[in-house]
């Protein structure tokens, strides 16, 4: 067996294993367990796109009571959520998310770099004290599926 065949076999096995875990997560969610999903947002130009994905996700599963969603924001994207410069539509969407129970986590490192506190952000945010990427890893270790649209 040559190296290429061994590599192909290993990749096929890995793909089957990963596909099985995704199928298991989907089956568990369909069996009455709420699916847990974390959305990752760092690109400023994707703010509206990601928020739209979350809205579509909630609508697609039949409402916020059927899914647990967290949104972790860091880097340039966080500027869009500064209270002083956020547009009213964005403020309404964030308020709706907060009322729906979506965790809105702002990276503490980014907040420090942008010289903003939680009171300077739109209402509903919590601070990811250890950093946004650490919060993403924590949520994934708790069974959240990771999405970065």
Q: Whereabouts are the PLM-identified features?
A:
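C-terminal segment of N-terminal export signals and the immediately downstream linker at the start
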Residues: 20-42, 46
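Extracytoplasmic
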Residues: 34, 64-66, 99
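Histidine-anchored nucleotide/phosphate-binding helix
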Residues: 50-63
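Acidic helix-start/capping segments at beta-turn-to-alpha-helix junctions
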Residues: 68-80
